[in-house]
Amino acid sequence: ALCDRLGITLAEECYSLDRVDIERSSYAHCPRPGGRAQLQAYDAAMLDVAHRLGTEAFFTGVGGDNIFQFTKSARPLVDRYLAQGIGLHLFSTLSDICRLTGANAFRVIREAAKVPRSGTQKYLWVPDERFLSKDAIAAAATSRLSHPWLEGPTDSLPGKAAHIAFLIRTQHYMDVHDRRWPTSTLHPLLSLPIIQACLAMPSWTACAGGVDRAYARRSFAADLPTETLTRSVKNGPDGFAHAIIRHHLSRIRERLLDGELAQRNILDREKLDAALKEQQIARGDDYPRILLLLDTEAWAEGWSAGSPASRQT
């Protein structure tokens, strides 16, 4: 529908297991891990389109949820109370959050009461400890990295502080472009004017009317087709991610249970062994974490080899 509205051609590609090498990291060119195996198939499809169409640059929608404050938190209610006090406007925001989340008013108010107020740290970074060994978790706790950007701002409203935290997360996307590609990758939603405009929006406007990213939807209401404007969910590569694990399960078990990370006591082999059973994979939701660890294993092997050739993609 969007391509029809804009008058541009839609290029459709399919994920292929043939384009995934679990012994190669999708972040092999980066100084830190963070990729997942399914990115290899996505990158391959992008390059196919680039070669076929003579593409010089890809414009992405990366960061949209962060910039437009996609949240189902009670923080906007706290912000509006701190900024404007009690009034009909507060009940309007309460109603918006209830409609957006499906929670009743008592649940939303209870969650709002837990939100830190001014003068305290507004957010905490909670590490994902799934499948990490006790020693690795303890080591990370005693040597936790810090940076001014990671400290919760004490002079902003709690909801806006969370918005800033969302923006910090976009740094993950900013330095992962493989410069060997024949194309550039541009993220227009992360441009400074858009960031500044969205940061200026009160947090409660992001859920106005009981819909997420409300001010972004209103801003483009005249330009987008109804199907796009009212979209609340979208498909992702979850099925393909499951297919990767099922197809390579025995090899994945070998690499994660006996690989570089396990040998360095970074992984909890017992928990991983239980998670990497066929029946558990079928019903579990740990597959993104497993694919991240799998890609990290390949990344660590590549850098441990010490040769640039070992990191070639």
Where are the predicted features?
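Bilobed periplasmic-binding protein-like "clamshell/Venus-flytrap" ligand-binding domains
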Residues: 153-165, 290
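Preference for short coil/turn "hinge" residues that link or interrupt alpha-helices
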Residues: 176, 182-183, 194, 233, ...
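Short, motif-level signal for alpha-helix interfacial/capping segments enriched in acidic residues
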Residues: 167-172
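PAPS-dependent sulfotransferase catalytic core
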Residues: 72, 226-283
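Hydrophobic alpha-helical segments, principally membrane-spanning helices and signal/leader peptides
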Residues: 46, 160, 176-178, 253, ...
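Active-site helix-to-loop segments that bind/position phosphate- or nucleotide-bearing substrates
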Residues: 294
